[in-house]
Amino acid sequence: MSRAVLSLGSNIGDRAANLRGAVATLRAAGARVVAVSPVYATAPWGGVEQDDFLNAVVVVEDPNSRPRDWLARARAAESRAGRTRDVRWGPRTLDVDVLDVDGTTSDDPELTLPHPRAAERAFVLVPWLDVDPEARIAGHGRVADLLAALPAAERDGVRPDPTALVSR
């Protein structure tokens, strides 16, 4: 069974609908959605002036998927949401990052695993911890420890949002 952890983010248009659409696209592509984190609002990362993001993390499984298959699914979800890649770290309808696949490590420039910046981004670590309190990032350590090591201002910048991505 291939298990992937994916980060979702949106700051253009109906942000909540974009995140929900990503979950629906993953399901339609045959992935079993194991867990969906609460949604968080966060300031943009990377220095480009833009609106705040809504962020979440999903854990998905598929017995027949390899790491590149998860990347293809992530890009398909982005495409379905109208994602364009005009400005690095710029505004986007949907961003889906493959954070981890079965603890695999890879230096492939097309898909580096674990995601090279996951360990330093509170907007990834907070929701990841929600769906897997024992999560580890290969080569970095426990998600809980990585989050605790970040500056308080960064952790505090990840604000709970009332948006629900799945029915409870």
Label each region the model flagged.
Residues 21, 25-65:
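Short, surface-exposed acidic-centric catalytic microdomains
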Residues 14-16:
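Short N-terminal binding/cap micro-motifs at the start of the first secondary-structure element
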Residues 45-54, 64, 68-168:
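Flexible, gly/pro- and Lys/Arg-enriched active-site loops
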Residues 1-6:
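Extreme N-terminal starter segment of soluble prokaryotic enzymes
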